[in-house]
Amino acid sequence: MGKSRILIIGATGYIGRQVAKASAALGHPTLILVRETTASNPEKAQLLESFKSSGITIVHGSLEDHASLVEAIKKVDVVISTVGGAQIADQLNIIKAIKEVGTIKRFLPTEFGNDVDKTSAVEPAKGLFALKVKIRRAIEAEGIPYTYVSSNCFAGYFLPNLGQPGLTAPPRDKIVIFGDGNAKAVFVKEEDIGTFTIKSVDDPRTLNKTLYLRLPANTFSFNELVALWEKKIGKTLEKVYVPEEQVLKTIAETPFPGNIIISIAHSIFVKGDQTNFEIGDNGVEGSELYPDVKYTTVDEYLNQFV
């Protein structure tokens, strides 16, 4: 059996570009759906050129244009959505088109974070996660084969400044820690998320399951992360612990979109939502399924900042 033909919707976005690159690199015939106007953005135009040179086919269309969706989906076996937060609900249009085409072997909706079915997040993250839950239930109700990729933290969002807003490098004097710093989280380099995602599309073990990236070398509590950084720079940082009550107050007082970021951080670093449950029968873990993937460890990632 040849490798599945893959359509990626949202391929010019932050995680979408990594998924698209991995798809081409792993030898899948890859199509991306982009609006005709995308090429008028210079940064996106350059990205589209690099996609073309790696053999990716560009098709024009959008989530609002049903005919374009159907036309693109007819050409492939697998659909991956990596659309951003503002378009989560619009994935109902993808579901409708997949249903109409009727030949899709797998749909991966936009996930790439915490498992939204296992969360104790507060608003506004709670509402954002609820939209993803709604999409999951719609996929299941239509009987569309799926894989949900729960890849946890993007390394690039968090590790370059150890979660300290406004800093461009990890701190060398003082660090603010939410909660007691003991909840464990998982930090995965974006390129590796792309690789694990594409590895899963033709794998019967991930069919109608959640693929968790709970990579052993990348699972750290905040305290462990700080200790690793201190060891690298040979210096002890002053640690400021923010109790949960204060974190909740900050969320309530912070305007959008800052409150979303803090409420997601609360879910991860105070509640431990990435690791506070066992992976059950409806889940599989990426590094166990694909031991051949040499992912970048947190230890290696931090070396660039020393």
Curated annotation (Swiss-Prot):
SUPFAM superfamilies: NAD(P)-binding Rossmann-fold domains (SSF51735). It catalyses: (-)-dehydrodiconiferyl alcohol + NADPH + H(+) = (S)-isodihydrodehydrodiconiferyl alcohol + NADP(+); (+)-dehydrodiconiferyl alcohol + NADPH + H(+) = (R)-isodihydrodehydrodiconiferyl alcohol + NADP(+); (2R,3S)-dihydrodehydrodiconiferyl alcohol + NADPH + H(+) = (S)-tetrahydrodehydrodiconiferyl alcohol + NADP(+); (2S,3R)-dihydrodehydrodiconiferyl alcohol + NADPH + H(+) = (R)-tetrahydrodehydrodiconiferyl alcohol + NADP(+). Keywords: NADP, Oxidoreductase. InterPro entries: NAD(P)-bd_dom_sf, NmrA-like, NmrA-type/Isoflavone_red_sf, PCBER-like. Pfam families: NmrA. Disulfide bonds: none annotated. The active site is at K132 (proton acceptor). Transmembrane segments: none annotated. It comes from the Eukaryota. Induction: Induced by UV-B, wounding, salicylate, ethephon, 5-aminolevulinic acid and abscisic acid (ABA). Belongs to the NmrA-type oxidoreductase family. Isoflavone reductase subfamily. Oxidoreductase involved in lignan biosynthesis. Catalyzes the NADPH-dependent reduction of phenylcoumaran benzylic ethers. Converts dehydrodiconiferyl alcohol (DDC) to isodihydrodehydrodiconiferyl alcohol (IDDDC), and dihydrodehydrodiconiferyl alcohol (DDDC) to tetrahydrodehydrodiconiferyl alcohol (TDDC). May regulate changes in lignin content and accumulation of flavonoids. This is Phenylcoumaran benzylic ether reductase IRL1. It comes from Ginkgo biloba. The lineage of its organism: Eukaryota, Viridiplantae, Streptophyta, Embryophyta, Tracheophyta.
